[in-house]
Amino acid sequence: MGREFASALARWCHLPDMPARPELVAVCDRFDSQPADLCRWYTENFPSIQQAASDYHELLANPDVEAVYCAVPHHLHQEFYCAALKAGKHLMGEKPFGIDQPGNRAILAAAQKHPELLVRCSSEFPFFPAVQRIGDMIEREAFGRILEVNCGFLHSSDLDPHKPINWKRQVEFNGEYGCMGDLGMHVCHVPFRAGWRPRNVRAILSKIVTERPDGKGGMAPCRTWDNATLFCEAEGGPGGTVFPLTMKTQRIAPGEKNTWYLEIRGMKASARFSTRNPRRLELLEYGGGEQSWQQLDMGQETAFKTITGSIFEFGFSDAILQMWAAFVYELATGQRRKPFAGCVTPEETALSHELFTAALESHRRTQVVRIESAG
């Protein structure tokens, strides 16, 4: 993801109305223990780079570095993120923003000591134009009373049982949340931004592939959850009503390549979107009489204006660019352009940890568990 971020900076000329332009001045990775190709990719493509470090302390000591993007395995989140904040750097971190709830709380405590710093978490899917349209509808309460919300992130990267193990399949590096920690913030972003709060959860978690090749001729145990389905009672929306909220995070989803989806059903309107067809937004607006689903083709109808014509398709790299535009815009102006054109906040990551911690307990007890933040 570091290279995805760097590539977004290289495309900054696509954003004609931004109040600031970021410059890549330093990179840090295990360059001393990796082939030179990675370091060379950065330095050859970004002549602005002044520092290529193998020790993150060296990068954080660089006075020319104002903000950092930190994408490391989950067990390093607390150490790296807190160090970045202590060094006075604005931070874009990765989900789950701490390997567990204590780690997340430590990061938030560090952030609270530095209110002058912008601290956000990566989540790009809400920047697809169709989801921005849905966000606008949520803002103006176009759905009316919320009846039901279904959302999820499904892919098949672990469908092959012979795929070698990596850190995301090892609990000591990924954490007990498993697929929830890796994928869940993507699923929670829109509901949490909408103000919809889970009151309780009944979780069904699945460990499907129990061991994988270790890359050394043997087998290694997989102790993380492959798939998770969370059934929640949530409250929010017009009138603060209670409604069912179902969230799915799956690494083993046959037939799915990398599918993020959102479905909202309301008394006045309903909407459906899936990245399986990233152009299509399905809408049902009901004012009495017959019901009719519309299919709208979305183009470059983005939160942050681009030079690309409005009729052309939007893709994953465009979502990454829009997410970084949101971060830079907020850093430069001190505010979000609009509620759903903003990155995940530390407080929203805390809500996700409350949900996932309760989900682990729910699965262990095979019971509905009340969410801590629900009181």
What are these regions (language model features)?
Residues 182-287, 313, 319-336, 356-360, ...:
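Contiguous beta-strand/loop segments that form the cofactor/metal-binding neighborhood of enzyme cores
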Residues 1-89, 105, 109-116, 336:
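N-terminal glycine-/serine-/threonine-rich beta1-alpha1-beta2 phosphate-ribose binding loop
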Residues 21-25, 122, 333-351:
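Glycine- and charged-residue-rich phosphate/anionic-cofactor binding loop of Rossmann-like
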